[in-house]
Structures are given as C-alpha cells and as structure tokens.
Design a protein with these regions (language model features):
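Glycine-rich phosphate/pyrophosphate-binding loop regions near the starts of catalytic domains
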Residues: 28, 35-199
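N-terminal amphipathic/basic leader segments beginning at the initiator methionine
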Residues: 1-40
Length: 200
C-alpha cells in the first residue's frame, strides 16, 4: 500500500508555516492588552496546543480546532452504506478541541460550534443536521462541558457545495494553578495520568 502524505491531501507546510510564524509574532505583540484587565499571558503556552492566561486565582485556557477532512469520510460512508455518521463526526470535532485543551492541565468548561456549509441546502437535510446536533450535545455531556453557542454560516463559493467544515472552540480553567503543564513543567521522566471515561 502506498502511504498517503500531507502534500497529496493538498497540505504543504512549507507554504503554510511562514504565515503561522508571522501570525504568532503579530499575536505575541497583542499580549500586553491583557494588562488593562489585570491579566497576563503565560508565555510558555504561546504556540502550544492551548493558549493560557493568568487571571489571578486560576489560569484561563482556550483553543480552536478544526476537524479537517474527516467530514469527507462521513459523506463517503453515507454513500456506501446509507448510514448517517454525523453524530460520530460531531463527537470527533469536540474531542479534538477538548484533547488540545487538556494538554495544558485545563478542565474544559465551554464549547462553541462552527459549522460552515457550502450552502443552505446542507442544513436542509434534517436527518443529517439533527444527527450533528445530537452528536454534539452527547459529546458535551460526555466531556462535562456546556455548549455555549456557535456559528452556522452558509458559505457558497467558499466551502464546496454539499460539504461542511466543522470546528470547535473550547475554554477551560487550570485550577489549582499547580496543574499547569507547559514549558518547564514538562520534561523527561514526567508522568501524565489519564482517567478512562468508559467510551469505546
């Protein structure tokens, strides 16, 4: 079997990374804005899986994560099997955001949804749309987070017709502060314990 590469999927990090570096440098210059609220960034978290802000008694952590091309798999499976997989895809989207957030020691609190379709017709398929909603709700319950809201743009001409781009943002807290796991808190010999939630 021939291995698949990011390049074959249209992802060229040699072209993407310069933008990411420029964005991180520009973003770092805005960190001083937090001081007007009495807050400060945890510099070691910049560029990591989640961004962390010191708000005094605890740390605030946030992340946004896109599912990527996995929705294409759900569409292909629906064509092959006739079964709807959007409840599972919803859970995958939340899992990606929550998993990134917990890497810094944060407890996730709130998830927001971003569901951008290639046109209003995508949302008009009631079975698929309701599966997405129910899967999203179920994932929130499993992760112990509130679903705060979100955005559902119909982006004809930007997103391909008949497709959807799924993403989630997640906000949480690191409390007590000693749970923070970035920078010097990570190193050789460290141990990370994960408690199973019973999902197979």
């Amino acid at each position: 079997m021939t291995p698949l590469t990011y390049e074959q999927a249209g992802v060229d990090y040699d072209k993407i990374d310069p933008l990411k570096v420029a964005a991180q440098r520009a973003a770092a210059q805005t960190a001083s804005q937090l001081a007007q609220h009495g807050f400060s960034e945890v510099q070691a978290s910049r560029g990591e899986s989640a961004y962390v802000v010191d708000v005094g008694p605890f740390y605030l952590a946030s992340i946004v994560e896109c599912l990527g091309s996995k929705a294409l798999v759900a569409d292909a499976m629906a064509r092959l099997t006739g079964k709807n997989h959007y409840a599972a895809i919803a859970q995958d989207t939340i899992a990606m955001a929550v998993n990134d957030l917990i890497t810094v020691g944060a407890t996730p609190l709130v998830v927001q949804a971003y569901w951008a379709a290639g046109g209003s017709d995508w949302f008009g398929n009631a079975e698929r749309s309701l599966a997405l909603v129910e899967g999203w709700k179920r994932a929130c319950e499993v992760c112990g987070v509130a679903w705060g809201g979100g955005e559902t743009p119909a982006l004809a001409g930007i997103v391909e017709a008949g497709r959807i781009d799924l993403a989630a943002s997640c906000t949480g807290i690191v409390n007590p502060k000693q749970r923070l796991s970035v920078g010097d808190a990570l190193g050789d010999g460290g141990e990370i314990a994960v408690v199973a939630v019973g999902i197979a």
